[in-house]
Amino acid sequence: RAQTRFVGVLEVQKYFAFLVMDSKFLANDIFIPTDELNGAGNGDKVLVEIVEWPEKANNPVGKVIDVLGKPGDNTTEMHAILAQYGLPYRYPGDVEKAAELIPEKIDEKEIALREDFRDVFTITIDPKDAKDFDDALSLRKISPTLWEVGVHIADVTHYVRQGDVIDKEAENRATSIYLVDRTIPMLPERLSNGLCSLRPKEDKLCFSVIFELNEYAEIKKSRIVRTVINSDSRLTYEEAQTVIETGKGDFSSEILVMNSLAQKLREKRFANGAINFERYEVKFNLDEKGKPLGVYFKESKEANHLIEEFMLLANRTVAEFIGKVPKGKHAKAFVYRIHDIPDSEKLDTLNAFILRFGHKIKTEGNKVEVAKSINSLLDKVQGRPEENLVETIAIRTMSKAVYSTKNVGHYGLAFDYYTHFTSPIRRYPDMMVHRLLERYLDGGRSVDQTELEMECKHSSDMEQVAANAERDSIKYKQVEFMADKIGKVYDGVVSGITEWGIYVEINENKCEGMIPIRELDDDFYELDEKNYRLVGRRTKREYRLGQPVSIQVAKANLERKQLDFVLA
C-alpha cells in the first residue's frame, strides 16, 4: 500500500464513481465521491490519489488529481505512463518564469575570465531530432604529430545556481526522460534547447577538458578550464557518418582526424578489458497523431563512437583529477559512476546457458580475462539467431551502473575512475560534478559525503524509473503497431520463460508478446528455471530460451501494453 497515486479510467455512476485500472498495480478499484471528480467525466483517463482506506472497506477512497484525457489519445497515454511512475509531464509555472528571467546575452566580463575557443574549429554531432546539444568537440594542430582536442560541455551551472527554483526542480527530476515520441526535459526548454544548448554560430559558455594527443592517441597533457566557444556547424550522426565513409564533405579533414584518434582510443579501451555491448535501439516512424507506421532499428556506427570515445575520455579524466590522489592522502568527496564486478554465480549461470549454443566464457581469473572472454562471446554471436538473447542474458549478468561517492571503478568500461560530466543538460549528477569540480579547482574544502551519497542514490533511483517509463512507452507503441495485425503469422524467438507463459520476440520488428501457458494444451508444462525452459510432463516436449518459433498474433491489449500470441 506504499503507492498512493494511480492512473485508470473513470466510471461515473449516479452517486459515486470508480477508478478502473490495470490490476497489476492494485487489485481493487478506487471509490471516488462525486464531489472529488475535479471536473473529470465518465470514460476519462485520470490520475487519482488515495485519501483513505477505511478499516472494513474493500475499496480505498480517492480523489481525482488530474484529468489526463481520453483513453487511446497519444498524449493522454504518454502522460498516463509518466503519471503512473510519479514522473512529471508539465513544468511548474514558477520554474518556467525563473528561466524566462535569465538574460540571453553573455556578459563581456564573464568572457574575459574564460579561455577563448571561438576561433578554433568546433562542431557538435547529435541525433537528428536532438535540440539539447550538451557537448562540442574542437580540434587544432599544435605540431606535425600533436593535436589538441577540446571536449566542451555546456556550462549549465553558470545559469542554474545551487538551491534556486530551477535547480530544485532539476534535482528532483534528476534526468530528462526520452519517451518514444517526446522528451520531458530536466531543465526548462529555454535552458535545455536555448541558452545552454551549444547551437552553431552562437557564443556559448562551456566547462571544458582540453587534451593534447599524439597520432597514436596517447594523452600527453590535459587540463580542465572554463571556456567560451562558437560552434562552426551542427552535424547529425548520419551526416558525420557519411563524411567518415566517403572522406568527402564539409570539415572532412578535421572529422577524419578526430575519428582516427577516437578509433585508437576505442581499441585501447577494449584491449584493457572494456566490454562491448552494442545494442540497437528500436525506433518508430510516427504520423502526426503519434500513430506508429513502421519500426526501424538504430545502430551505433563510427560517428557515434567518435563522440562516445571523447566523452568517455573527458568523464574519466575529470574523475581521475579528483579521485586519484597520492598514497596516504584522502580524495575529496565526489560523484562517481560506478559499475561493480559481476557476481561469480551469475557468470556460472551465463556459462551454463550459452553452452547449449556451443559457446563458453571464462568465469575465473582476473577481471580483464573474464571481460575479454565476454567480448569474444559477443563477437561470436553477431548475426546468429541467438545474438539478441545471449546479449540480453549477458547484460542481466552484469551489475547495474549507479552513482555513488564510494568509488569501485567501472567494470564495463574497464576504468578505475569514472564519472558523468558530459551531459549536464539532461542529467543532474553531471550538474553536481560541475559544481564539485569548480569548488575543488578553486581550492575549496570537501563537501559532506553523506549528503552527497543521498543525492547519488536519488539520481540512480530516478534513472531507473525513467528507464521503466521509456520502456513502457516503447511497449505501448509496439502493441499499437501490432493491433491491426491480428491473425498474422510471424517468425520469432523465445525471449522469456515463466510459469504463466512463453515470451516471444518477433524477428522482423522486435515486438514481444506472450503465449499464455493455457494455450499449450497438448501437455502439462513445468518450468525448469535453471535451464530457462518449459518441459512437458508427458511428451517431454520443451520450449527453451532462444528457440525459434512461429507465432500468430491473437490479441493486442493497449490498456495493459500486452500482446497475446498462439503457436502457428
Question: Where are the regions a protein language model picked out?
Answer:
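Append "with occasional cross-activation on large, charged helical scaffolds in nucleic-acid assemblies
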Residues: I224, Y237-N507, M514-P516, D521-Y532, ...
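Hydrophobic residues embedded in beta-strands of well-ordered beta-sheets
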Residues: Y15-F18, W147-V149, I219, K291-L293, ...
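A short beta-strand motif that forms part of the nucleic acid-binding face
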Residues: D22-F25, T34, E52, I153, ...
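Charge-lined substrate channels and their catalytic hotspots, especially those that engage the 3′ end
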Residues: R1-G150, T157-E202, R234, Y532-L534, ...
